[in-house]
Amino acid sequence: MKNKVVVVTGVPGVGGTTLTQKTIEKLKEEGIEYKMVNFGTVMFEVAKEEGLVEDRDQMRKLDPDTQKRIQKLAGRKIAEMAKESNVIVDTHSTVKTPKGYLAGLPIWVLEELNPDIIVIVETSSDEILMRRLGDATRNRDIELTSDIDEHQFMNRCAAMAYGVLTGATVKIIKNRDGLLDKAVEELISVLK
């Protein structure tokens, strides 16, 4: 039986990584194993090895051609991991760059990963802005709530395009403040 490849996406600050980690812990208690792979971390490792960046948040400022090359290499590495176990790929559906939105999972990455499910984690732009302002561990750009809304809209558009190209289903999960457990239960039902 083929291992599942599930992509979990969301704008920075939406809580997708936290949601995914808590979901994997709960699934493990039920005997269901998933390996979490962060696409950005794999990309960062490749870029850092090449001396292109020093911290993760510099990734989105790389020129598009460099980002595309690094995406392809990261996709190949993750595809190899998916041969061994169920994988959740924690990533961004789109990356906001100075030159416009870049697809987080372009065709050359999708062809490698061939995901079964794409999950978009969302919440209100006000909640995202407050989370970003409260996170001193990251060097994030400050955006207006209207910019965050636009980014979430672009993520939905991109995720549906990914679904069209791969046959993956697309699920939207709301991760509202104080309701993480509800979002975890919803993601568990998608992954079982």
Curated annotation (Swiss-Prot):
<keyword id="KW-0808">Transferase</keyword>
<keyword id="KW-0963">Cytoplasm</keyword>
<keyword id="KW-0418">Kinase</keyword>
<dbReference type="Pfam" id="PF13207">
    <property type="entry name" value="AAA_17"/>
</dbReference>
<keyword id="KW-0547">Nucleotide-binding</keyword>
<comment type="similarity">
    <text>Belongs to the archaeal adenylate kinase family.</text>
</comment>
<comment type="subunit">
    <text>Monomer.</text>
</comment>
<dbReference type="GO" id="GO:0005737">
    <property type="term" value="C:cytoplasm"/>
</dbReference>
<dbReference type="GO" id="GO:0005524">
    <property type="term" value="F:ATP binding"/>
</dbReference>
<feature type="binding site">
    <location>
        <begin position="10"/>
        <end position="18"/>
    </location>
    <ligand>
        <name>ATP</name>
    </ligand>
</feature>
<dbReference type="GO" id="GO:0004017">
    <property type="term" value="F:adenylate kinase activity"/>
</dbReference>
<protein>
    <recommendedName>
        <fullName>Adenylate kinase</fullName>
        <ecNumber>2.7.4.3</ecNumber>
    </recommendedName>
</protein>
<keyword id="KW-0067">ATP-binding</keyword>
<dbReference type="InterPro" id="IPR027417">
    <property type="entry name" value="P-loop_NTPase"/>
</dbReference>
<dbReference type="InterPro" id="IPR023477">
    <property type="entry name" value="Adenylate_kinase_AdkA"/>
</dbReference>
